[in-house]
Amino acid sequence: MAEKTSDDIFKLIKDENVEYVDIRFCDLPGVVQHFSIPASAFDESVFEDGLAFDGSSVRGFQSIHESDMMLLPDPNTARIDPFRAAKTLNMNFFVHDPFTREAYSRDPRNVARKAENYLASTGIADTAFFGAEAEFYIFDSVSFDSKINGTFYEVDSESGWWNTGEPFESDGSANRGYKVRPKGGYFPVAPYDHYVDLRDQMATNLQNAGFTLERGHHEVGTAGQAEINYKFNTLLAAADDVLLFKYIIKNTAWQAGKTVTFMPKPLFGDNGSGMHAHQSLWKDGQPLFHDESGYAGLSDIARHYIGGILHHAPSLLAFTNPTVNSYKRLVPGYEAPINLVYSQRNRSACVRIPITGNNPKAKRLEFRCPDSSGNPYLAFAAMLMAGIDGIKKKIEPLQPVDKDLYELPPDEAAAIPQAPTSLSAVIDKLEEDHEYLTEGGVFTEDLIETWISYKRENEIMPIQIRPHPYEFSLYYDV
């Protein structure tokens, strides 16, 4: 695809009668930030001089005494917003230092761009493709609070199994049944698939935004767990796609009076929501992961890439599974990939090699640990850097395991390395093991230190010091 220029953007604004341009960038934890300017004020100076903003008010960015930052546009990301009342053009920006004009080291999009450039500089490959499968839950309502004298959360859904005993639906009509059982939601037709029309509207909005869709369906969980798959993209663009995907899914649900969450584990006793990451390397237009003589049709490069992913997984998960809630999902019994091995077809392995027939271009690996709770730019960049390290050092993964890893005898299971079980553990591992991330200056020490301190201070510690409601069930009467 040809690179877009400022002239292309000005033409688009004129042709589409755009009224506002929405300026978008990503904070360090992974939430899109934005502000809007009138289209009449969006001129060539934006491309030359950038737009200023207060970096001290953005999570993970600057201190107040050096808060001024600058945004420069990425014309390739321009899209018409499907939800705004006024005709609005959304565009992603890169963050820069306003004095040196250097790309900002903590800008997640810049990290993703540097990872792509580093891959090319190694000579191993010139392109990394990523395809994300972001699962989510559709709920009718949500409420939660955390106070000094009480903590609670509650979600509800007309298709939730917990509503089988209610006499009425939410609209006041009689309960008509067809509630999805926990772990029983994979592929049922309506009326079990209660939100199929909403999912179709999500799919329509995604296609209108430029996504090439593959399929949409109800996922395993009760209460409207869903998945909509779309075509892969190059690393930076794929991370852009994840955040645009989440924006469209959430706002389509919002317009329909529903609420969507990409939390890894919103429900106790049912499957969590992952973001399986398919990935492959290419050079000069040719795929590098295929060799029909290798196990599962994998080349040596692919096997060593997997070796890097598995070897660094305990620290890598600090970016691919970066929340406390992530580790409520990575537990046995819910199809979660907790075993740090690879396998063909086997979904109980951390890395799966999908069956792709004899098509070399389709050969890829699927890293099944990641979820959607973090920053896709940092997650994809970290996965690529781990894979590159595996290739450069020829890291051999353990022998593939084609058995059901959940049903292994205890002696065999003990020999299988497991993913860490808490955010605290992976943050500690990141502190010990991150040299592979700083190769080529892709991740800086400053970014990694900021990530570690942010996670400890804002997520790990606040949860550690608060009583959990279930503790009252266990201990109130001690």
UniProtKB/Swiss-Prot annotation:
UniProt protein name: Glutamine synthetase
List of residues binding Mg(2+) 1: 133, 276, 366
EC number: 6.3.1.2
Amino-acid positions noted as binding Mg(2+) 2 in the UniProt annotation, renumbered to this chain: 135, 219, 227
GO biological process, one term: nitrogen utilization
Catalytic activity: L-glutamate + NH4(+) + ATP = L-glutamine + ADP + phosphate + H(+)
Subcellular localization(s) per the UniProt record: Cytoplasm
Residues that, per the record, bind ATP: 214, 230-232, 278-280, 347, 352, 361
Cited Gene3D superfamilies: Glutamine synthetase, N-terminal domain, Glutamine synthetase/guanido kinase, catalytic domain
Binding site for L-glutamate: 271-272, 329, 335, 347, 368
